[in-house]
Amino acid sequence: MKVARFQKIPNVENETMIPVLTSKRASELAVSEVAGLLQADLQNGLNKSEVSHRRAFHGWNEFDISEDEPLWKKYISQFKNPLIMLLLASAVISVLMRQFDDAVSITVAILIVVTVAFVQEYRSEKSLEELSKLVPPECHCVREGKLEHTLARDLVPGDTVCLSVGDRVPADLRLFEAVDLSIDESSLTGETTPCSKVTAPQPAATNGDLASRSNIAFMGTLVRCGKAKGIVIGTGENSEFGEVFKMMQAEEAPKTPLQKSMDLLGKQLSFYSFGIIGIIMLVGWLLGKDILEMFTISVSLAVAAIPEGLPIVVTVTLALGVMRMVKKRAIVKKLPIVETLGCCNVICSDKTGTLTKNEMTVTHILTSDGLHAEVTGVGYNQFGEVIVDGDVVHGFYNPAVSRIVEAGCVCNDAVIRNNTLMGKPTEGALIALAMKMGLDGLQQDYIRKAEYPFSSEQKWMAVKCVHRTQQDRPEICFMKGAYEQVIKYCTTYNSKGQTLALTQQQRDLYQQEKAQMGSAGLRVLALASGPDLGQLTLLGLVGIIDPPRTGVKEAVTTLIASGVSIKMITGDSQETAIAIASRLGLYSKTSQSVSGEEVDTMEVQHLSQIVPKVAVFYRASPRHKMKIIKSLQKNGSVVAMTGDGVNDAVALKAADIGVAMGQTGTDVCKEAADMILVDDDFQTIMSAIEEGKGIYNNIKNFVRFQLSTSIAALTLISLATLMNFPNPLNAMQILWINIIMDGPPAQSLGVEPVDKDVIRKPPRNWKDSILTKNLILKILVSSIIIVCGTLFVFWRELRDNVITPRDTTMTFTCFVFFDMFNALSSRSQTKSVFEIGLCSNKMFCYAVLGSIMGQLLVIYFPPLQKVFQTESLSILDLLFLLGLTSSVCIVSEIIKKVERSREKTQKNTTSTPSSFLEV
């Protein structure tokens, strides 16, 4: 006899050995062997002393969450951002150079950014403690011969646990008693159909398939039907549920594309800043200037070139995106996640509960005499109709249909109360059908005399009943189950009220109809009735399906059209998976489907080569999903994973963005996810992708504005310094320009409304820097116009070679007006300001008006004139400056027009793009 594999832990006090059995091994052993190995008493349970001893070694039946780091450490960790570190260095240098105004402004900017990021992370990132919510707070346990209520966390290996309908299994159990037990394991395995449980030893499948362990009740699963007793074999992290937990802890979440872009931008800015320092120092040294003086000037210029407002605008832009997503019933747990969806090009979606409702529904009826009926409505309720040849059938109006409904209703243990199912989903679908026909009261009209419960071996259920008002008549037998099994007990079939002999021709006809319904993704049940099991009359077939969610097909179509590939990953059969995928538009003639077993045999390298053409993965487990996602990421794809069950949790965390269902999603799933869809609406993902693309565009708009302004200011001061010109701007004027650069006008660019055309554009490549060649060109063009225009005004005013307050006021105001027009043209990289609407962004309008009012106060308000060393300008001066500075906006509009014309020409000349599956 094989020796059980288990871990032996010595008990110090009584020198006994406490074993730890895996569910795979326990399922192969007889109950007596398991009890012997666990030193357990199945009937009387453990005594309290033994429970204490075992808990000392096994711990509590809960998950070991590592202690969270202190808040101060979390706060300090925010400073590790490259841009923040660069700003800190700038602030320190400013203090050393006694430029306290810059030092204060930079320090305040740092504190704002860090605090906002810290608060957001603190509120949104919960620890994995939410996992414990899946474990019920109480359970029924036998100890010292008594049945008692105890906390689930108190259980230890060897405890005897009692289960009944509605209970959530508190630990992994080896069942030793089971009466018509059916457990919903969809949250763990992805299988929609509840698993029938037995007590006999079951050889475990070689691939470790949990569904093959039919004598094991797994932690976190739900008892749908029957009752049972089991012995605890695994608690906490030693359970199968705990394995998922450990996989989650081991998986590190990848950096988001925005984080990568910001890191790259920080490095680029550092490189450019130090490059400027080196060049200015070298040129100054060659010109014979004092090296220390040149170093001071160079560092000042480098500090001025760093856009310290960038982290603030990025944070604010993302936060506003999160707020907009909340209004659309989506909770984003981390700020950069919304933007990540903007470059997502693959969505891996679980079928059950995500693309479908996880509510079995009858959609088609075939009577034994060939009559077809369509059933409308979805879910466990009375809303819907049964339609035959265009007419609505109700009650006993159509006997052929009514008899099928009657059999399905009477041969049934499920109950629907307040639209909530208590029982098996398949039986719930039949009760809902009866409710639509007004026949659900038939269950109470019959008295059940005998019952033949459903089992996975026989694949049918039957009952013997008598009508309450006709108890003196012979018993009637009703049967439902798989067609291949039910037909064996049938000798006749119903044809327009007459009972006719069941011929081979009729059997072949029913077989064809059954196959046709199955190919459409329907689960087919046959129903029959008669005086005895061997003398049944076939009544007909019903087709049941887990229907797609409302609006999913439309969302899928839009996403595919925008260049996003969608792959369905499910534990269902190939036939069902392909049928659902076809209905949703995910599966075409050129698509491929791959099983979980095939995924097992492939290396990630091989899988990454075929995965672009695969639309459906069936019979997939959590480890398969992980492998699929890794293969997609190996191809450079940005992967989003949607799901609602425990089986999705690891993949949700491994994906670039995990999306959980809020209503049907398990707590472990929600904690692993980056975004939660409150209403389980798949369409919200499309809105999130649109939001993500819009957010990235807004960030690019801000970067364009701020860098062009920074470069212009840097170039202006550098030229004046190198050419021994008087400084065209004084310190306070430069500070005011910096406030405008990083203040309301700049930040209002981050709240620009999302362009409705953005969803039609393909996902961007996450490898691309935020500073693309096109953006750099636009930045340089704007900078050159600003520098040339400002120098022209300075040269025009400085004809006597004596600098006066008027000279600096004209130059200063010219630069500020250039800033305002530059901000206006930066609102969109592709559309004209008139096309997007001058007042479509009210915050921008208020910010620009406020800045102009502030500039006028600086020019005309005497106290501020002294501070900024300015003087009043005439109306002609202002009109001249407005005309000159508007050139930066006019040139930008011309560039946009040229780009749109070129893009339109390219679209007309290029061929049709390849299939969306070629990701």
Swiss-Prot record:
Membrane topology recorded in Swiss-Prot or TrEMBL? Multi-pass membrane protein
Top EC category: translocase
According to its UniProt record, the EC number is: 7.2.2.10
Residue ranges annotated as Cytoplasmic topological domain:
1-78, 122-263, 318-700, 753-776, 829-843, 894-919
| Transmembrane segment boundaries | 79-95, 100-121, 264-283, 296-317, 701-723, 729-752, 777-795, 803-828, 844-863, 877-893
**Main localization (coarse):** Golgi
| Tissue specificity annotation | Ubiquitously expressed. The long isoform is only found in testis.
Q: Name one GO molecular function term.
A: P-type manganese transporter activity
Q: What does this protein do?
A: ATP-driven pump that supplies the Golgi apparatus with Ca(2+) and Mn(2+) ions, both essential cofactors for processing and trafficking of newly synthesized proteins in the secretory pathway. Within a catalytic cycle, acquires Ca(2+) or Mn(2+) ions on the cytoplasmic side of the membrane and delivers them to the lumenal side. The transfer of ions across the membrane is coupled to ATP hydrolysis and is associated with a transient phosphorylation that shifts the pump conformation from inward-facing to outward-facing state.
- Protein's UniProt name: Calcium-transporting ATPase type 2C member 1
Q: Which gene encodes it?
A: Atp2c1
